[in-house]
């Protein structure tokens, strides 16, 4: 199998792209398109050229619906150990706007989003991406790019401290992980966030 990924934008010459993909022997594409309707437009074109299409969906980190959710539900965003929400701050890059998985509303939002894509006729599959928290430690090769050193887990990049997550953890384990000298070393807290 020979696959690639591609950002789809309405108006692009997707037919010629699929023709080139077919000519070089590509079998499929993980397509990142803004809406289910964009997939409905792209799939027949790709299939005409023998190309399978998987929807490439960002889940915990928002992409196409980021601004809308920031405006309507800022309380849905993940919070770092310093108490800062991604609704109000950034982690590394501006597009890192991860949601908090402890919130039932967030889980329902993601479920409905995936369901909408599952209903797209002809879609061959779905690839889920960014189904996690912000990177707590980046690869060492990226440290100079961001002007940071991450020789341990630092509070500014340690996410998963949304008040609802803290409440649920305390309910299960009887304490607030922030009471630890270094919460990143608390095995129960680490496992809880997995």
Feature map (PLM): residue ranges:
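Catalytic domains of carbohydrate-active enzymes, especially glycoside hydrolases
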Residues: 9-38, 120-123
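Hydrophobic faces of well-ordered beta-strands that scaffold small-molecule active sites
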Residues: 2-6, 29-31, 53-57, 126-128
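Glycine-rich, aromatic-flanked loop segments that form ligand/cofactor-binding clefts
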Residues: 43-91, 127-135
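A structural motif corresponding to the C-terminal end of an alpha-helix
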Residues: 24, 45-49, 116-124
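Conserved structural scaffold segments of CAZyme catalytic domains across common CAZy folds
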Residues: 1-6, 12, 20, 188-194
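Polysaccharide-binding and catalytic clefts of secreted carbohydrate-active enzymes
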Residues: 88-194
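Aromatic/hydrophobic pocket-lining residues that form the small-molecule binding cavity
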Residues: 14, 39, 106, 110
């Amino acid at each position: 199998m020979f696959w690639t990924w591609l950002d789809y934008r309405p108006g692009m010459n997707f037919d010629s792209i699929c023709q080139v993909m077919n000519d070089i022997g590509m079998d499929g594409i993980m397509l990142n398109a803004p809406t289910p309707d964009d997939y409905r437009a792209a799939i027949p074109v790709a299939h005409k050229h023998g190309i399978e299409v998987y929807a490439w969906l960002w889940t915990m980190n928002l992409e196409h619906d980021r601004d809308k959710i920031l405006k309507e539900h800022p309380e849905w965003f993940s919070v770092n150990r310093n108490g800062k929400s991604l609704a109000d701050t950034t982690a590394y890059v501006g597009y890192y706007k991860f949601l908090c998985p402890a919130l039932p509303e967030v889980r329902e939002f993601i479920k409905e989003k995936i369901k909408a894509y599952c209903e797209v006729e002809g879609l061959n599959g779905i690839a889920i991406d960014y189904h996690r928290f912000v990177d707590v430690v980046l690869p060492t090769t990226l440290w100079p790019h961001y002007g940071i050193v991450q020789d341990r887990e630092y509070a500014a990049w340690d996410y998963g401290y949304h008040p609802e997550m803290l409440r649920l953890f305390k309910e299960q384990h009887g304490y607030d992980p922030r009471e630890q000298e270094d919460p990143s070393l608390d095995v129960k807290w680490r496992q809880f966030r997995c």
